[in-house]
Structure formats: C-alpha cells, structure tokens
Amino acid sequence: MYGYNERETNIKQIMEEKKSKMEKLVKNFYRNKRILITGATGFKGAWLSYWLHTMKADVIGIGRKPNKNDNLFKQLNLKKKIKIKYFDVREKNKLEKLIKNFKPSIIFHLAAQPIISDSYKKPNETIMINAVGTLNILDLCKNYKFVKSIICITSDKCYQNNFSTKGFKEDDK
C-alpha cells in the first residue's frame, strides 16, 4: 500500500510525463505548418509569433509598425525570425493577396484596437478595425480550402466590467 508521500510523488511523476507528451504533441503539430498571425506586432501576437517560431512553424505576421523601442516584437527581434507585413487588416486587397500567396493552413486573428482609451475617443475606428478586420478574414478564407482553422483571439475587454476578481466565464455579459 502506498503512503501519502509515495502517492503524491507518483502523481507528480505522471503529471510530468503527461506534460512532456503534450509539449511534444503541440510542437509536432505546429512544426512546418504555415501560420498567419494578424496583430503580430502587438503584445499577445508577438508572444504567439515567438512560440510558434520556436516550434518551427512557418509564420507570417501582419501588424502595425512598432513605434516604441520597448515593443515586445522588437525586443524579441521577431523581424528576423518570422516574415512580417505592415498593413491594416481593413485593407482587404492586401490581405487577400497575402493569404493567396502564403497559403496558411492556420490563421490566428488577434488584430484589434489595443488601447481602451483610444476606443472611447475613436469608437467608429475601433469598430471598423475590430469588426471589419474580422469580417475580412472570415470572408476571404471561405474561398480557400487550404485554410483549415481560424482562431479569433480577443481580450477580457469584450465583457462588461462586473468589478469581480473571479474573472469571466463564456456566458458573462
């Protein structure tokens, strides 16, 4: 019969083995996949670009030109690690040309108005960036069978502030 400490050690060992297997599965899944990331120069987009690059994915990013030296995209030196195109996802013709030529099998869509205070100052522009950019991606990709997945990533700012410290659930307002 196992003692408490032996059982705990055994569980930790099993979890480490499962974690290692999962990491291998994820790395193998993304290796050599052609992946398009919109919003690649933003905080989340830069991290995603970095990790997919380390997994040997073929990554192309779309984003705004970073204008600050403390920008994560610049700090990670991603311009030398992934392909990058600087344009707005509202520019449907450029987006279509890129998708048609690069032929991504997976698209991570992160492009959005990143600054909340700017969204209050420029609500129409924010809606155009967030909604029309997403519509362009979805509309264009319905024509291409090589696109297998589109993952739209947002933030907690899509939820009404409920002043809770518990975080949000999918069915929150």
Describe these PLM feature segments:
Residues 1-173:
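N-terminal Rossmann-like NAD(P)+-binding domain of SDR-like oxidoreductases, especially those catalyzing
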